[in-house]
Amino acid sequence: MFSNIGIPGLILIFVIALIIFGPSKLPEIGRAAGRTLLEFKSATKSLVSGDEKEEKSAELTAVKQDKNAG
């Protein structure tokens, strides 16, 4: 999604943000964006690990059923 944004594009976005929000608000906005990104990453990581746990649980159940049947 953002792979096409280069250095000039990032500089342009930063300058526009500086004009809109002013220099005093930029650190606060940066911290908020960083926290949001961190929460998003941890949420996606927990979703992925939850899926892996479900797959392992299903495999263990299948193995137990095969062992009990055989």
Curated annotation (Swiss-Prot):
Induction: Expressed under conditions of phosphate starvation.
Family annotation (Pfam families): TatA_B_E
Keywords recorded for this protein, A-Z: Cell membrane, Cytoplasm, Membrane, Protein transport, Translocation, Transmembrane, Transmembrane helix, Transport
Location(s) in or outside the cell: Cell membrane; Cytoplasm, Cytosol
GO molecular function, one term: protein transmembrane transporter activity
Transmembrane residue ranges: 1-21
Domain of life: Bacteria
Biological process (GO), any one: protein transport by the Tat complex
Recorded topology in the membrane: Single-pass membrane protein
A GO cellular-component term linked to this record: TAT protein transport complex
Subunit note: Forms a complex with TatCd. Two types of complexes exist: one composed of TatAd and TatCd, and another composed only of TatAd. Soluble TatAd forms homomultimers bigger than 100 kDa. Soluble TatAd associates in homomultimeric micelle-like particles with a size of about 12 or 25 nm in diameter as well as in elongated particles of 12 nm in diameter.
Function: Part of the twin-arginine translocation (Tat) system that transports large folded proteins containing a characteristic twin-arginine motif in their signal peptide across membranes. TatA could form the protein-conducting channel of the Tat system. Required for PhoD secretion. The cytosolic fraction of TatAd binds the precursor of PhoD.
Family stated for the protein in its record: Belongs to the TatA/E family.
Extra information: B.subtilis possesses two minimal, substrate-specific, Tat translocases: TatAd-TatCd and TatAy-TatCy, each one composed of a TatA and a TatC protein. TatA is bifunctional and performs the function of both the TatA and TatB proteins of Gram-negative organisms. Membrane-localization and maintenance of TatAd is assisted by TatCd.
Protein name, UniProt field: Sec-independent protein translocase protein TatAd
Origin organism lineage: Bacteria, Bacillati, Bacillota, Bacilli, Bacillales
